[in-house]
UniProtKB/Swiss-Prot annotation:
InterPro entries: DapB_C, DapB_N, DapB_N_CS, DHDPR_bac, NAD(P)-bd_dom_sf. Its EC number is 1.17.1.8. Belongs to the DapB family. This is 4-hydroxy-tetrahydrodipicolinate reductase. The keyword NADP applies. It comes from Methanococcus maripaludis (strain C7 / ATCC BAA-1331). One of its GO terms (molecular function) is NAD binding. NAD(+) binds at G8, A9, L10, G11, R12, M13, D34, G102, T103, T104, S128, Q129, N130, Y131. It is found in: Cytoplasm. The gene is dapB. Its main location: cytoplasm. It comes from the Archaea.
Length: 270
């Protein structure tokens, strides 16, 4: 039985992951953690998420180290925000706890700080901007399209719910990174356009971020040339697709000794 701790336990992803862990053989929720001074601290996380009592009380991140030690957690799952996630990852790594990280919005410095802690403490982690199986097939397909349609103009459009705090999305940034790595030409990423921008240059890969309503996550990459346009789209209609992917990542990383992995590793797409 793999003992799992979940941070952001009452968030959209955290609560979904907790529910699915309780339905998954071989996994057990041993700690549920949210922000300091949370008014529901001490209440049973099962009752808070509609599962009924499961015997795990909501804890807060200011006591993370003690909680991880007491619970004996083997894997910690984090879908929160960049700054607290870095601190959480450092604490977990120091204690020898493996990680599944789905948080986005890291600066390069934050990402490096987190990865250094993981490597120095010789734990294992999966880090991904999007754990949905379909979006990773989308990423894999982008590799081929970028190789074969490298002389086309390329634009990326992403849309999310009005509550999303970072832009562009981690998924859009990952798509742009994959495209750049597979083009046989120079390229540079820009973000939206405004004013008199002049003609579009061949090097541009432009990301456009839209926000509104309750959209879970839409991503489209558009390849255009004179006379034709090819669009590759992925749409998440339920967070359960992300949750299911995170569960697979927990199962994957649980018995790993050390290393930093992504969802291509989890899904054997490399």
């Amino acid at each position: 039985m793999v003992k799992v701790a979940v941070t952001g336990a009452l968030g959209r992803m955290g609560s979904g992951i907790i529910k699915t862990i309780t339905e998954t053989d071989g996994l057990d929720v041993v700690a549920a953690i949210d922000i300091p001074n949370h008014p529901k601290k001490g209440q049973d996380i099962g009752e808070l998420t509609g599962l009924g009592k499961i015997g795990v009380s909501l804890s807060t991140s200011d006591e993370l180290e003690a909680i991880l030690k007491e619970s004996g957690a083997e894997v910690l799952v984090d879908f929160t925000a960049a700054a607290p996630c870095v601190n959480t990852a450092k604490t977990a790594a120091k204690l020898g706890v493996n990680l599944v990280i789905g948080t986005t919005g890291f600066t390069p410095e934050q990402r490096a700080e987190m990865e250094n802690a993981i490597s120095e403490n010789k734990v294992a982690a999966t880090i991904s901007q999007n754990y949905a199986v379909g979006v990773n097939i989308f990423f894999k397909t982008l590799e081929l399209l970028a190789q074969k349609l490298g002389d086309y103009d390329i634009e990326i459009l992403e849309m999310h719910h009005k509550f999303k705090k970072d832009a562009p999305s981690g998924t859009a940034l990952r798509a742009a990174e994959i495209i750049q790595n597979n083009l046989n030409r120079d390229s540079n990423i820009i973000y939206g356009r405004e004013g008199i921008t002049g003609e579009r240059t061949k090097e541009e890969i432009c990301i456009h971020a839209l926000r509104g309503g309750d959209i879970v996550g839409d991503h489209t990459v558009i390849f255009t040339t004179d006379g034709e346009r090819l669009e590759l789209s992925h749409r998440v209609t339920s967070r359960q697709s992300l949750v299911s992917g995170a569960i697979r990542a927990i199962q994957f990383v649980a018995d790993k000794k050390e290393g930093i992995y992504n969802t291509f590793d989890v899904l054997d797409l490399n």
